[in-house]
Amino acid sequence: MDSTTSPYGTFYNEKFATADLRSYRKKGPNPWTRTLIEALKAEGVEGATLLDIGGGIGVIQHELLASGAARATGVETSSAYLAAAREESDRRGHTGRVTYQHGDFVELAESVPAADIVTLDRVINVYPDWARLVGLSAARARRLYGVIVPRDTRFVRLVIVAMNLVLRLQRQRVRAAVVPLDAIDRVVREAGLSLCFSRTVGPAWQVVLYRRD
């Protein structure tokens, strides 16, 4: 799915990518992403392969490669984010250890290889067919499957309703949603993975990690 036709590729443009990259270089990973990274490192990432779906500027890729992961694959609909991820990868000396695929993971899934670790950082909540996304991505995880999703609280739901209203008024096609964690859990367990870590970070985010049985 090309960024010129994908609502995600169009919405997450160069302005977003530049701001995210600047923030990452100045402050490092945000608290929720850092929590997932630390949980993955606690399980062991040395020599591991990573599949990072919708990873934006590639924060998880950069951090795990710096911590001993062998290789990473980034699948992203936004060409602006892919360019920023490549730029940061080159700057960190990771060129040759990262493969990039431009498009919708669900559409590309058959051509995307499995990896020891699969991550989706704030992706499930903005993808229309979340169950298919989770099912296909969980099946690619040989060892660990980590996701970050909005907490299922009244406050978060109200924020998302307001955000979607603004997006509608701006004529954007991107929408967000709160997907109940137990619904995600059922799909992930069907793929043969079990919960090994769960933590709330701030008022909005839930960080969850699964391990293959």
Where are these regions (language model features)?
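Conserved SAM/SAH-binding beta-strand->alpha-helix loop
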Residues: 78
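A short SAM/SAH-binding and catalytic strip from SAM-dependent methyltransferases
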Residues: 117-129
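Conserved beta-strand signature within the Rossmann-like core of class I S-adenosyl-L-methionine
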Residues: 142-151
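Conserved SAM-binding loop
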Residues: 85-86
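A short, conserved alpha-helix within the catalytic core of class I
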Residues: 127-137
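Conserved class I S-adenosyl-L-methionine
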Residues: 1-43
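Conserved SAM-binding strand-loop segment of SAM-dependent methyltransferases
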Residues: 94-105
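Conserved SAM-binding loop of SAM-dependent methyltransferases across substrates and taxa
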Residues: 57-68
